[in-house]
Amino acid sequence: MMMSVVAVMAWGCSTDHDSDDRYDASIRLSELPDTAREFIAKYYPGAKISHVGRKGTVTTTAYDVEFTDGAEVEFDATGLWTDVSAPRGKAIPTGIVLPAIDQYVSGYYPGAAINEIERIIPSGYEVDLTNRLELIFTQDGTFLSSYD
C-alpha cells in the first residue's frame, strides 16, 4: 500500500522531464517574473486563470499562462510576452499591439481583428487575424507581407 501511495505521489508531481532535457512544470502565478504578472494585471484584469506553467531546457526558460476562456500568453525568461492569443474568432486585448500594426489592420482589414500576435526575434511580429489571414511586420510595425 505504501508503495502505491509513493508511486501516485511521484506520478502526480508537477514537473515532467523528457529525453532531450526539456521540462514542463506547473507553477503558481506568484512565481512568474514581475513583468509577466504586471502584463496579466494590465491586459487581463479579473480574468480567471486555468494554468500557469514554466517550460524550457537547462539553458532556456519560458512561461505560459492559460485562461479559462481559451486565451493564452507566453513569456520569455524575463517576463516579456512572446505570444498572445485569443480564443478562435476573438480579438486579443487592445493596447498590446503597436499602434502602427493596429492602424494597418483596421485600415486594410476593417472587418477583422487581431486574434494572435507572436514576437519573432529579432525581426518583428507575426499577426494572425480573425479572418485567418497572417501578416508579418517589422519591429517598428511596418508591414512586410501577408499569407493565408
What feature does the model see in each segment?
Residues 17-25, 80-90:
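Acidic/histidine-rich, surface-exposed loop or edge segments in extracytoplasmic proteins
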Residues 7-30:
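Bacterial Sec-dependent N-terminal signal peptides
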Residues 61-87, 128-148:
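Amphipathic N-proximal alpha-helical interface segments
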Residues 1-7:
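Sec-dependent N-terminal signal peptides
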Residues 27-49, 92-115:
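Short, non-transmembrane alpha-helical segments in secretory-pathway proteins
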Residues 84, 99-106, 116-118, 122-125, ...:
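Flexible "stalk/tail and boundary" regions
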Residues 29-70, 74, 78:
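Post-signal-peptide N-terminal segment of Sec-exported extracytoplasmic proteins
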Residues 50-66, 113-130:
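A cross-family detector of function-defining hotspots
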